[in-house]
Structure formats: structure tokens, C-alpha cells
Amino acid sequence: MLNTLESLFNLARERKKSPVDGSYTNKLLSDKSLSKDKVVEEINELIEAVENNSNKIHEAADVFYHLIMYLEANNIRVEDVMNELDKRKKWVTM
């Protein structure tokens, strides 16, 4: 399960280093405005899907993918995000 997320992180980093012409992933990585807009769009679509009880899994997957690309486009390392979550986990268990 987590291997899939790790593969997406690796894909984002590889495409950022070695772009592929015409790649949607590269479009997201090189156009921060597009990447941001897609995250907002996909989150709204997920909310609508949950409320309508349809396509929830598909839309959730879209959110994960676009968020990962947005983070990478903006040089936000997933390792730093995970470290922050680890810190918060300690607060919750207190």
C-alpha cells in the first residue's frame, strides 16, 4: 500500500530531474499555478463524491496524486511532512 505512494514520490522526483515531453506529470511539476488549481479542483471533486457517495476512491486517488505533484513542484519534501506528522502524533498521544 505505502509502496504505491512511495512510487509516486519517486516518479515526481525523477520527472523533475529528467522531464518527459508531453507528460502530464511534468506539466504539473513545471507549472505551479496549474498544480495548485488541480489540487483545489480535485479536493472539491472528492468532497462532492463523498457527499454523493459516488466515485470516492477515484477522486481520493486524484487528490493524492495531485497533492504529491504540488508538493514536489514547490520543493516540499515528503520526508519533512512525515517528520511534522510524527511530531503531531506525540501531541495527540499526550
Regions found by a protein language model. Name each.
Residues M1-A60, F64-M94:
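Flexible "arm" and connector segments at domain edges
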